[in-house]
Amino acid sequence: MGVKKSLQTGGNLLNLLSSILTVLSTTTNYWTRQQGGHSGLWQECTHGKCSNIPCQNTVAVSAACMVLAATFSIVALGIGIRIQCREAESRRSQNTIVLLFLSGLLLLIALAVYTSKNAWKPEVFFSWSYFFGWLALPFLFIAGFCFLLADMILQSTEAISGFPVCL
C-alpha cells in the first residue's frame, strides 16, 4: 500500500472515530452534571425525570452546529470511502477536505458557545458527552490533513509525470 492509500485509510479511520464521537456527543444528555441531575443539548434530567430544555439561544446554536458537524462528517466519510475504493478524481478529495475542516469548525463553534454559557457556573461540571465532542475535534482536523496530504501527493505525481527523469 502506497503513502497516498495509507493517508486515505488513516483519514477514513479517524473520520469514522470522530463521526461516532460526534453523534454520541450530540444525541446524549450528559453534557453537564449538577446536584441531582444532568443535562444535554435536548433534555435536562433531575432526580430521574427528564424534560425538554426551554429554548435558549446558546443551546440552540450549539445543537445546530453539532448536528451540522455530525452530518458533514458522515458525508465526508462516505465520500472518503468512495475515493479509497475507486480511484476518484481530485475534486472529490478536495470536497472531503473541505467537509472535514468545516465539520471541525462547526464542532469548535458548538463547543465554545456551550462552554461560554456554562463555564462560569460553579455548581455545574462538564460530563462525558461534552468531552466526546472535544475528543472528536482533533480527529476531524487530523483526518482532513491526511486527505490534504494524499491530495498533494496525487497532484505532485500528476505534475511531474510528464517530465523526463535522468538519474
Swiss-Prot record:
Q: Which residues cross the membrane?
A: 13-32, 61-81, 96-116, 130-150
What positions belong to coiled-coil segments?
A: none
- Localisation: Membrane
Which terms in the GO cellular component ontology are assigned?
membrane
> Per the record's keyword annotation, is Secreted included, yes or no?
no
Keyword terms, alphabetized = Membrane, Transmembrane, Transmembrane helix
Membrane topology according to the record: Multi-pass membrane protein
Q: Which Pfam families would you find in this protein's record?
A: PMP22_Claudin (PF00822)
- What is the first-listed, main subcellular location in coarse terms? membrane
Q: PANTHER family, per this entry?
A: CLAUDIN DOMAIN-CONTAINING PROTEIN 2, EPITHELIAL MEMBRANE PROTEIN-RELATED
Annotated family = Belongs to the PMP-22/EMP/MP20 family.
Its recorded name reads Claudin domain-containing protein 2
Question: What's the source species for this entry?
Answer: Mus musculus
